[in-house]
C-alpha cells in the first residue's frame, strides 16, 4: 500500500453517484443501489462480513436499494429507499443504533426510525434527518454531541431538542451541525476550539446558533 500525492483512479468501480469517507475507509454508492467500500476494516466498517482490510472496493453484504450514505470514524451508515437506516462497523458507544454495543461486520438496522432523508456520521456518533425536519442522534455523547440535553451515551435514537425545520446535517468528531430551512446554522457538542461558532468555548448539550452567519 503506497501513499499518493496525486489523484489515482479507484479501479473496478463505475456508475458511482455518491461518496463518503470515514477516518480510514471509503464508502461509495452506485446507481444500482449497491454500496462498495475499501480501506481499514478492523471493526467491520467495510461491511463485507470480515475484518480484513481491503485496498480495492468490496461490496457491502446484503445491502440493496440504498439512496444515501455517510461515514463515521470507524462505522458506516446507509439509508434504503424504504426510509430505513442500516449501519455497520464499530459500535462501542452504540453508534450503529441497534440497541447494542457490539461491533457488526454486516449491516444491521437502526431501530425505531423510518422516513429518513439524510444521515451523517461523527467520530463515534450518528445523526439522521427525518422527512419532517427533525433530527435524531445516537452513539457517544460525552460532550453533548447528540443534542438531547445530556451527556449520556445512547444505543438507540434520541431527538435533538429545540430544533425543527432542518434542511441539512453534518457530524464532526465530537460535535454536530445543522442548517435550518431559514438558512441559519446550529451546532452542539464539543466547543473547546470554538467549533460551535457561538463566540464561546463552552461545550453545549443543546443546539446553539452559529453567530455572524
Please annotate each region the language model reported:
Residues 1-6, 38-56, 88-106, 136-156, ...:
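Short glycine/serine- and acidic-residue-enriched loop/turn motifs that recur at repeat junctions
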Residues 3, 15, 22-23, 53, ...:
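Beta-rich catalytic cores
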Residues 11-18, 31-34, 56-68, 81-84, ...:
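Tandem repeat domain/solenoid detector
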Residues 12-15, 22, 39, 47, ...:
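Glycine-centered flexibility motif
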Residues 24, 33, 73-74, 83, ...:
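Short coil/turn segments that connect the beta-strands within blades of beta-propeller domains
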Residues 25-28, 37, 75-78, 87, ...:
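Conserved core positions of repeat-based scaffolds
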Amino acid at each position: 500500500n503506497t501513499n499518493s500525492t496525486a489523484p489515482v483512479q479507484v479501479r473496478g468501480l463505475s456508475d458511482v453517484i455518491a461518496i463518503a469517507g470515514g477516518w480510514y475507509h471509503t464508502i461509495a454508492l452506485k446507481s444500482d443501489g449497491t454500496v462498495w467500500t475499501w480501506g481499514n476494516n478492523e471493526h467491520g466498517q467495510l461491511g463485507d462480513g470480515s475484518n480484513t482490510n481491503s485496498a480495492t472496493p468490496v461490496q457491502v453484504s446484503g445491502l440493496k436499494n440504498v439512496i444515501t450514505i455517510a461515514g463515521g470514524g470507524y462505522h458506516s451508515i446507509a439509508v434504503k429507499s424504504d426510509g430505513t437506516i442500516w449501519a455497520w462497523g464499530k459500535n462501542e458507544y452504540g453508534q450503529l443504533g441497534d440497541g447494542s454495543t457490539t461491533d457488526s461486520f454486516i449491516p444491521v438496522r437502526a431501530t425505531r426510525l423510518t422516513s429518513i432523508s439524510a444521515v451523517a456520521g461523527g467520530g463515534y456518533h450518528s445523526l439522521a434527518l427525518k422527512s419532517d425536519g427533525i433530527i435524531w442522534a445516537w452513539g457517544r455523547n460525552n460532550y453533548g454531541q447528540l443534542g438531547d440535553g445530556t451527556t449520556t451515551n445512547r444505543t438507540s435514537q434520541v431527538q435533538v431538542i429545540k430544533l425543527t425545520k432542518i434542511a441539512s446535517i453534518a457530524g464532526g468528531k465530537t460535535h454536530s451541525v445543522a442548517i435550518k430551512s431559514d438558512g441559519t446554522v446550529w451546532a452542539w457538542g464539543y466547543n473547546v476550539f470554538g467549533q460551535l461558532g457561538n463566540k464561546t468555548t463552552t461545550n453545549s448539550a443543546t443546539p446553539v446558533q452559529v453567530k455572524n452567519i
